[in-house]
Amino acid sequence: MKGRYGLELYYHKKRVIVFWVIASLSGLIAISILSFFLVKVFRDKVLNLDSVSSLYKNWDLHTAEGYSSVYETSLQILENKPYHNTALAFHGYSSFMLAESETDNMKSQQLLDEAIFSLRTAKRNCREDVLPQINYMLGRAYFYKGKLSNYHYYSDLVVKYLNLAVDAGYVSDDIPLLLGLSYASLGDTDNSIAAFTEALLVRESDTLLFNIAKQYCNNEQHSVAKQYLVRVFETSENEDLLNKSHILLGQIYINEKNYDDAEAEYNYILQKDENSADAHYGLGLVHELRGDNIKARAEWRKCLKIQFNHPGALKKMA
């Protein structure tokens, strides 16, 4: 009996020891798991807050270095959290700013694509108070993308997003000018004139005056167009813009059937630059309207010799 009792006691103690060993190991495992999650929470919350804070801080520097820092930091956040809204917005902002200053056209296009993708993704779940600025930056990005590509494929998107920003109360000095140029490329003359006129109240420039004159010419309001061209002649020192203004004035005179003054404008340009394709083309139009097709075609041949793909001359010589 004593032997059996002693054996049972031995096994009982052994089971108790095994129990406590297992319990201790389970406790250690539980503590390790808890520690892991606590560290992860700390890293995700505290360190992520530091990263987001640095986005605002570096963006407010308004420098190339600041934009580069925002770009890299937002990229790091998005690697772990692809739909982090603040990171998406700032990645879009910084990509655009870097694209604007990039001298390599291909790199600039890649950055613009990043900007547009990030901003469009950010729009899906952003705060209502942030949405107007995202729309504004999207409008700017599409405008610059169209400018780089030398086409107007994106003008409708520029108008769409900038108007969304304006309708929500967003204000920026460059919006009227961007809208004016985009409406012009879409052939919406009335809205272009309205936007350019608003831009003129913000800051007058010779280029803006020329663009307004061009739109009034397209709208067949020639007397108003000439008034703006006079202001260009009075204020501009940009030789290229002045030549474009004389070309436009020559076109206005042709529309008014004032062929002598139109000829004078084109000859004025050719006295300074005999290789002006547009001036030779304009002279050809004057000769054609006077009934002298031989002289007209001679001028258009000169035009094509200078600029082989001049659309107007190609059409006339076809």
Residue positions per predicted region:
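N-terminal leader/linker segments that initiate helical-solenoid repeat arrays
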Residues: 2-124, 128-129, 133
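Register position in tetratricopeptide repeats
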Residues: 97, 144, 151, 185, ...
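Helix-start (N-cap) detector for alpha-helical repeat units in TPR-like alpha-solenoids
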Residues: 51, 85-86, 129-132, 173-174, ...
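Canonical tetratricopeptide repeat
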Residues: 90, 137, 178, 211-212, ...
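Structural marker of alpha-solenoid helical repeat scaffolds
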Residues: 80, 125-129, 168, 201-202, ...
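Residue-level recognition of tetratricopeptide repeat
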Residues: 59, 93, 97-100, 140, ...
